Amino acid sequence: MNIQFQGGINIAIKIPKAKYEATVAFYRDTLKLDVQEREIKNPTVSRTHEVKFGPNTVWLDCVDNYTHSETWLEIQASDFEGATRYLASKGINTCDELEEIPADTHWIMDPAGTVMILRQQDTKYTL
């Protein structure tokens, strides 16, 4: 099995509601980055802002029930289904119950608990 992985362009920062406005202002007003609020239909994320961060996109997600922030990453695979089986053989199982996502993606976690969205390389992930 010759599966290749590479980092994706999307980075999500899950932010507690009490710190959300200050965090958005930091990226927009202090760092002067391009920050745009985007519509989101997700039961666990109440608001989201897209931040252009060099070649990457940082998603500032307001999560009402969080007490601290978390950073979630994107990982792409050359063979999505094969990668899912390969990761399971290494003890890395999907955890799609974390948050609603498209059917052709999975949530996984590294051993330290960093959440990653796994998707097929060369496909576009949309909210």
Q: Which role fits each region the language model picked out?
A:
Residues 1-7, 85-127:
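Vicinal oxygen chelate
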Residues 1-24, 71-73, 122-127:
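N-terminal beta-strand motif that seeds the catalytic metal site of vicinal oxygen chelate
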Residues 18-35, 87:
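Amphipathic alpha-helical segments
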Residues 32-40, 92-98:
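Short secondary-structure junctions
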Residues 34-71, 115-122:
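Conserved short beta-strand elements that form part of the metal-binding/catalytic scaffold
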Residues 48, 74, 105-107:
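Short hydrophobic/aromatic beta-strand element in the GNAT-like acyltransferase core
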Residues 69-88:
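Mid-chain, well-packed structural core segment of small domains
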